[in-house]
Amino acid sequence: MTIKALLIDFDNTLVLFNEDQFLVAYAKLAYPYLTDFFDEATFFQKLLQSTLQMIHNDGSQTNAEAFTNNFIADTPSLDFEECNNRFRHFYEEKFHELGDTVIVVPYGRELLKRVLDAGIQVVIATNPIFPELATHARLRWANIADLNITLTTHAENMSYCKPHPEYYQTTLGLIQRSPEECLMAGNDPISDMSASALGMTTFLVDLDQEKGRLGILSKEIGNSAKKEAKRFQYRIDASGSLEDLEHFLFNFERR
């Protein structure tokens, strides 16, 4: 069976960035939209806690709902709709300024174009902690927003995060593909490679450690991944650069 769909991670796979610096810059830009509800320190803690709530989401609500419900907890004056409106204005007006904090991986767009030209579906399997509006802005940063991508996972169409295998089950259901038809590629040896628990082929993308810096959220994801690893056996089928990924994909033979 040949590969019919490539699922590929985004952060530190298609773009490189310093996670903690990004989070601080994000908070600085977003805080002015909610100054009438929180002081700056409280806002940052709310932001972090609500993001972690998405990472640990159990499927009972979308990740976006998990974020907002946690963010407004203990703040009766801020309701669900108003909170979402404030963040939407931020994403529409200021979020684009964070594009300068990422470095585009040079071969990413070319790889995806070649994959699409070969008739293989492409899914941007980014950890879904951003809403759709922000996620598509991030695709523009990577210069891939114009490509015919089948699906991009985001906080509004997902109820789990990586490394939970349920994230991959949901994704495969949306694109109507079996695990055997799909290849998952990304830089994280557990969060991305956990797709193998479903029977997907996996490819570990080499990370430029000098440019891509992991931070507090990745550490929390890593802790979650270690817990998941006790439930499932993960496998790495191949590894290398994005160029190596292309060669592996186009010369794939299922063992």
What are these regions (language model features)?
Residues 14-16, 53-55, 126-130, 157-158:
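Short histidine/acidic/glycine/proline-rich micro-motifs that form metal-
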